[in-house]
Regions:
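Protein-protein interaction/assembly regions in multi-subunit complexes
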Residues: 32-252, 257-272, 278-300, 314-324, ...
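Polybasic, lysine-rich low-complexity intrinsically disordered segments
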Residues: 5, 15-17
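Autoprocessing domains of the Hint superfamily
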Residues: 25, 33-34, 359
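Extended C-terminal regions of large enzymes
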Residues: 103, 124-126, 201-204, 208-214, ...
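Intrinsically disordered, low-complexity proline-rich regions
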Residues: 20-21, 26
Length: 741
């Protein structure tokens, strides 16, 4: 599927559009979708205690559809959601070689989790997608809102595996009303999310669009390595299809490489407190009601998530010098208020806006009747889903652009083209800095003046990704490949690109400046899939509140928080209700950052659905099993050791003289008081060299402390003792660890 520009890693630009399709502007009649290639009928059954006890496997190469049983071992050790996905993928890949992302054996796995699909508990509508990433060549997971995972479960399946490569473009339809799975030829269906979802909802949903949820990507995923998955749901209040994204790691690129235009699930049944088959309905009602009342009372006083969503973070990050500006060179800018909560308070459509039924946090948000200024839909008024903080910071401030309408337009086209806004923003910012440093020029960029702040050029990059032409697909290869291309084609200095290229493990950084937080450097660098904040977000605890001054305290938090956050992905939950709204007396508790009152509530929630009583320690243990298994999975893929936990120096300290001097008082003070270095009569360059030495040494010490706390050896590999303790010492796991012992 990917064009030859990407396959060869060449900079040869296509002369014309690769994906030119008249159907972008002309409607496709739904009757063209009816040639069934494969079909599988099944009995519907009933969800019991959060499970169907079976998963669905679709082999596109052989057009074979099968059902697999879920055994008790799988539930006990992998719980559901991300855990199920990882276990299924682990067993699908060849044992005699390392599979690549575009090998037919690779899968796109999607699961919900036992708690997912509960309407009375906030944040219970998440799906988790897992695959081998085109960016990292290792396993990647992505947590996403919407109705798909819940509908998949209510249609009879705890997880979905899509394996193999179809010979022609296809649509997968899972009919949870009739108990039927079909693979159909896609014919002339467009790739663009907003077009294909509308067509498929009309075909399969008929007069009930709310019964349909669609997973799709877009043409940008066909021409880049960071294609996202769009998960749709129907907004009854606005009478429109809405979207959330499984953005990180390029799973959308994998889906399009398999020639899958869309996966559709249908469920027309009523969603009630009993639909998920809970073990204790009354406890579930009680714990859900308590949480919802707390959110309705306290959210207006705290972050106003139900009004401004995550946009409130822009002002906070800017205030604490944590907002990425100009490729993470700086942490604040006087123009940041033009991207902040008060701007989006006015722009967001009013009224309840949640991505799951019954979620009182309701933080989805979108912009109604936004008139597009560029691209194939110029002049059209559209509904834009978002933007959220990561998009605002990524395609906005990090590219030196402080224009809210521009960010909204970028958000829209990234969704339509199926592109991860975080990777788009961070990769574009890297290309901009390379351009300003003279490492590449206009000839390299096919005529684009790629300066920071040039919003027209940034938008054109995205349109080129959608069309598969120009410099856009080069940026779409991601920072790691761009560094290689710029060095080989243009003689760019590799050392400076290594320092300023904000990627680790091949994945672009999400949007927080980490220079002054050693713990967050570890949160990014030690994250399993690469530098994504959903695993460990410790900046405030470390930098602002100074609650972990020692390496041991940092290591403890870099153990506990990733473990607890992992638990959300095992169960089909959103993390935001846990700590974006907190009890009124939370500050008086022993460890307020952990919000133990809410964790105890999650334990009750787990019991109410599954019937299994658990403690906080049990929750951490559940996550530890899956977390360590994923680390070992990376080892199987040829990664997962100490060297792969490296991060670029800009994540650690100032790369340029300009960066140092923007915080000169802070850095001079640290050199003198923390490291005992005499700054008198020293040049900026000398001080930068000294600071780098000290900070890089600290990061290595942090690795040692975290590895020890997690039960890993000095090379970052889980020990045999650790996996035996976690009861994941499967024969192939033990054999793999012995090779790296």
């Amino acid at each position: 599927m990917l064009n030859k520009t990407l396959q060869s890693h060449s900079l040869t630009f296509a002369k014309k559009s690769i994906y030119l399709r008249s159907v972008v502007f002309a409607p496709v009649h739904v009757s063209v979708l009816h040639l069934v290639i494969a079909e599988f009928k099944y009995s519907l059954g009933k969800v019991e205690r959060g499970y169907n006890n079976r998963t669905l496997h679709i082999d596109l190469s052989n057009m074979r559809i099968t059902s697999k049983p879920v055994k008790e071992m799988m539930k006990d050790k992998f719980i559901g959601g991300r855990g199920f996905d990882l276990w299924l993928l682990w067993n699908s890949l060849p044992k005699d070689r390392i599979a690549k992302w575009n090998d037919p054996e690779n899968e796109v796995c999607i699961a919900c989790g036992p708690l997912g699909g509960t309407p009375v508990y906030p944040g219970s509508g998440k799906s988790i997608a897992v695959s081998i990433s085109p960016l990292t060549a290792a396993v990647v997971d992505s947590n996403v809102g919407g109705y798909f995972g819940a509908y998949l479960k209510f249609a009879g399946w705890d997880a979905l595996e899509v394996q193999g490569n179809a010979k022609k473009e296809v649509v997968i339809f899972i009919d949870g009303d009739q108990g039927n799975v079909q693979v159909e030829e896609a014919f002339q269906l467009p790739s663009e999310t907003h077009l294909i979802v509308d067509i498929l909802a009309k075909k399969y949903g008929e007069d009930n669009p709310q019964s349909i949820s669609v997973v799709s990507s877009g043409p940008g995923a066909e021409h880049t390595f960071f294609g996202c998955l769009n998960f749709s749901w129907y907004d009854m209040g606005r009478k429109a299809h809405r979207y959330k994204q499984a953005g990180r790691g390029g799973i959308g690129t994998v889906l399009r490489d398999k020639k899958v235009k869309a996966i559709v699930v249908k469920y027309s049944g009523k969603i009630t407190v009993e639909t998920n088959g809970p073990a204790d309905v009354e406890t579930l009602k009680q714990v859900g009601s308590t949480y919802n009342l707390e959110i309705r009372k306290l959210d207006p006083k705290q972050n106003e998530m139900s009004v401004v969503g995550t946009t409130h973070l822009v002002t906070i990050m800017n205030e604490f010098d944590l907002l990425p500006v100009d490729n993470f060179r700086f942490g604040s800018n006087k123009e940041a208020q033009s991207l902040g909560r008060e701007v989006y308070r006015k722009k967001f459509d009013k009224g309840f806006d949640g991505c799951w039924v019954g979620c009182s946090l309701a933080c989805a948000h979108g912009v109604r009747d936004f008139e597009l200024k560029t691209g194939p839909y110029k002049g059209q008024k559209v509904f834009v889903n978002g933007p959220e903080y990561e998009t605002i910071a990524g395609v906005g401030s990090n590219c030196g652009i402080f224009d809210a309408d521009y960010v909204i337009e970028m958000n829209y086209y990234c969704d339509v083209y199926g592109l991860d806004t975080i990777s788009v923003g961070t990769a574009t910012a890297f290309a901009m800095e390379c351009y300003e440093l003279g490492l590449i020029d206009k000839k390299s960029t096919a005529g684009l003046d790629l300066r920071f702040g040039n919003k027209e050029a940034a938008l054109e990059i995205v349109h080129q990704m959608g069309r598969g032409e120009g410099f856009g697909p080069v940026v779409g290869q991601g920072i790691r490949r761009m560094k290689k291309i710029f060095e080989e084609k243009y003689g760019a200095e590799p050392r400076i690109m290594q320092d300023i290229g904000m990627e680790a493990k091949g994945l672009e950084f999400s949007e927080y400046v980490t220079k002054e937080s050693l713990a967050q450097q570890g949160g990014y660098g030690l994250a399993l899939k690469g530098p994504q904040h959903d695993e460990a977000w410790l900046i405030f605890l470390d930098m602002v509140h100074n609650l972990m001054p020692t390496f041991e305290q940092k290591a403890e938090n870099l153990h506990w928080f990733p473990m607890f956050r992992t638990w959300f992905g095992l169960n089909g939950l959103c993390k935001l209700p846990w700590n974006d709204v907190v009890p009124e007396d939370n500050k008086e508790t022993k460890e307020p950052a952990k919000v133990f009152a809410h964790i105890e509530r999650y334990a009750k929630y787990f019991y109410a659905v599954t019937g299994k009583k658990v403690t906080v320690d049990d929750i951490i243990l559940m996550s530890e099993r899956v977390y360590n298994f994923q680390r070992i999975f990376n080892l199987r893929m040829g990664f997962g050791t100490r060297e792969h936990d490296a991060i670029p120096y800009r994540a650690v300290g100032p790369v340029t003289k300009e960066e140092y001097e923007s915080r000169v008082d802070r850095y001079d003070k640290q050199l003198k008081e923390k490291f005992g270095y005499d700054t008198a009569n020293k040049s900026t360059e000398e001080k930068m060299t000294a600071l780098r030495k000290f900070r890089e040494m600290e990061y290595e010490k942090l690795k040692d402390a975290v590895y020890e706390r997690r039960g890993w050896n000095a090379n970052g590999v889980p020990t045999l003792e650790k996996v035996k303790k976690l009861d994941i010492d499967f024969p192939d796991v033990v054999e793999l660890l012995k090779k790296h012992g």
